[in-house]
Design a protein with these regions (language model features):
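Short, low-complexity N-terminal intrinsically disordered segments enriched in polar/charged residues
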Residues: 1-35, 39-43
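Short beta-strand segments enriched in hydrophobic/aromatic residues
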Residues: 28, 41, 127-129, 165-168
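A solvent-exposed, acidic/Ser-Thr-rich amphipathic alpha-helical stretch
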Residues: 34-129
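Extracellular/periplasmic carbohydrate-active domains that bind, remodel
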Residues: 89, 126-136, 227, 231-238
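Short, surface-exposed coil-to-beta transition loops
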Residues: 105-107, 142-149
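Short beta-strand edge/turn micro-motifs at domain boundaries
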Residues: 120-124, 145-182
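Short, cysteine-centered beta-strand-loop-beta hairpins and adjacent loop/turn segments enriched
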Residues: 130-142, 171-174
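A hydrophobic membrane-anchoring alpha-helix module
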Residues: 179-239
Length: 239
């Protein structure tokens, strides 16, 4: 049976974990993904970031992914400045950065388990998000419903991110049948320079979670945290 002190410490750990993920999605909302590794992840080299299509494994790979996202954001904002010179033409690069993309990822249904040894924790959230991107087809807003899963490790007395997994159950343009998620909007010449934007390929390419389609059968959510003593006795949200 846990003592009052241990229960208090676990309450503090739970609050810290919620705050970390709140900062994570806020960093994405503010297009500051390039700050995430240094501010929210642990200092270990074996961190990872997973999506439906695979994992970025290792500190360098994760940082390069986030930096590529920010570079793409800067290019999209510059493109909009050319298209709307009256509204955006006088903005500096710093003021302009982040104009266009909008990533709203509200977190809900929080559930976590902390290891009996107190050194690690696991948590899962549902996400009912709406993400606006600037593409070669212009601004496109997609529903992005799914899950955030994460492993945390204690470092210098505080919980830090170790492995993050963000999988989408639904990804489709707003106003489109979920069973027909294809983006069939025409390309627009004024946005053509955005066609060559590509993010780094995952370190490990695999289908981690299949997005909903008319041909997909019923899919279980990602495995939720279960009581465990040490991390060696449980599963990982990373690779």
């Amino acid at each position: 049976m846990l003592s009052t002190l241990q229960l208090t410490e676990r309450f503090e750990d739970s609050r810290e974990i919620k705050n970390i993920m709140g900062k994570y999605v806020t960093s994405c909302l503010l297009c500051r993904e390039d700050t995430i590794v240094d501010s929210l992840f642990c200092s270990r080299d074996d961190i990872s970031l997973g999506f439906n299509h695979g994992y970025y494994v290792g500190r360098q790979a994760v940082k390069e992914y986030y930096e590529a996202v920010c570079a793409a954001t800067a290019k999209k904002s510059k493109c909009l400045q050319k298209i709307f010179p009256e509204q955006l033409g006088k903005l500096s690069d710093e003021e302009l950065y982040g104009v266009g993309p909008f990533k709203a990822e509200p977190l809900t249904s929080f559930y976590m388990q902390e290891a009996e040894d107190g050194e690690t924790a696991k948590a899962i959230w549902m996400v009912e998000g709406s993400i606006t991107d600037i593409t070669e087809k212009g601004p496109v807003t997609n529903w992005s419903w799914g899950y955030y899963c994460a492993d945390f490790v204690r470092e210098d007395g505080h919980m830090k991110l170790w492995h993050v997994l963000r999988v989408e159950d639904v990804h489709c343009p707003n106003g489109v049948d979920w069973g027909m998620p294809e983006n069939n909007f025409p390309e627009l010449p004024e946005f053509s320079e955005l066609k060559d934007i590509k993010l780094p390929e995952p370190t490990v390419k695999e289908t981690v979670y299949e997005t909903y389609s008319a041909s997909r059968g019923p899919a279980k959510p990602p495995r939720g945290p279960e009581p465990y003593k040490t991390f060696a006795e449980t599963f990982s949200y990373g690779v």
